[in-house]
């Protein structure tokens, strides 16, 4: 196999161009086989095989810098830089990350995971290169979806002032060029991408600008005249008008054409956008037909394309989706907003039932929140469904546009807590901290599927901003015998004991049910509390616990700094200084990829680890807290 010849970075330079098509097919076969066993992002990676091969053919690693926006499409890049043998460990604890990681390879130039930042990072590299007098190429690869994020345009606007080379590859996998203008676009593209044309254009502009007083004006006038015609045919005029050179569009599966274009782009003295048309899922029919399903998928059967792991029960996202539709049927003023993730957040079902009340704003979390603020002021009830790790991109908008105005906006914070395989960039470990600091924000977390539905109904009737955080994965269906009404700022006591109180939040209620059972075996009859509300804090309950408890244990799947436990510590220190508080939370560090259960063991959040901590403290009391 040709693929077996790739052992380390730049080995691709030894492969004859005639063998590249076969190499592309071998890489596709390898990706399908490998991801079918481990799970991962498949459709996007199948779409960029030729694009990645073409880039590696014209670049040298690790000297040149290749920055992937989001980064989930970098599997072929990992293969070509000598990591093929590690793919059996993809997204597993201690194994290969599903995203570029600088700590994994010096060929990964930027740790990725979130959207629309690649051009900014690339521009930073370019300025650092020029300031230090170094000589290497910088390439940022960004998808058409990521271009819906405003940060990308901020960077493009800033890059327009550059006078040195910076290559931006627009990976367009939506095939947005209409057939009726495709012929003209390709014709004009062929003219504009010829070496003679680009060289002549740069030289002519430079020469004309030297004409005293009128040079720059002449160049601007010519640009305006030709743009009035070209804008009718070429989508790239958006970039040209911003001051960037535009090359393309080019077939993203024709490697020779792309190599010619990339080599031409390397000659441009300034920022250049190379527009590449690719097809998601190429080479595997199930992924090509259903790219959304194969965006991120678990292990699957190659023949059928269907997951090999069946759902045992509905996930929290499914429960939220059904509950939202039920509430929307009763509340005509309720609307739903997503930032380009209707499937991931469960809003696809809502969009089908209530299309006029559904808004997909693109990858633009900041806009989504301010947009929701306007909707709330206009008299409707917006529900903003966003992953925890992505919502943090809109902290200022939540604080300034929503909380400051005390607006009734509901935040459905999906993937809160540990998410597992996607690692540091996707763990939802910070939302309690950043949401709790906002004046007027109500923050809730359900213990099970029933409580999520009830909290959503409560949020719709509440005043001001409300956030409901819930985890990834199957919805906990235990403790159904406890179904007390949700009241503002009130916890739910599941068992009354003495001496030790365990206050569990959201997903940790399931874990702490085991903890309390284990403590009972050791003679420790602990009070077990389903916290429900992070904010407002249930101070009445804390006052009550202080009367007959020596130890209060808080358990949450959030970083300790700024978390629920610290809030309880602060209150108890001020009002009940004699009570010891043990906050159990995620330490002050980023959590890598791995299985959620395994990560909990590492972080001291497993039932056994929590029980051991409590037993250790209990045995240290001279008078004891055992019965």
Task: Show the residue positions of the predicted features.
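Structural signature of the thiamine diphosphate
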Residues: 218-286, 408-413, 432-481, 607-627
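Glycine-/acidic-rich phosphate or pyrophosphate-binding loops and their flanking alpha/beta elements
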Residues: 260-263, 295-296, 305, 315-330, ...
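A glycine-rich helix N-cap at a beta->alpha junction
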Residues: 86-96, 161-175, 196-199, 403-415
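Non-catalytic terminal/interface segments that mediate subunit docking, oligomerization
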Residues: 65, 270, 278-391, 397-407, ...
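Long, well-ordered, tryptophan-enriched scaffold segments
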Residues: 3, 174-320
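Cofactor-binding active-site loop characterized by glycine-rich and histidine/acidic residues
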Residues: 41-162, 316, 333-334, 338-339, ...
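N-terminal amphipathic, basic-rich helices that act as targeting or association modules
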Residues: 1-80, 244-259, 272-278
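Peripheral docking tails and interdomain loops at the edges
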Residues: 299-303, 307-312, 420-422, 442, ...
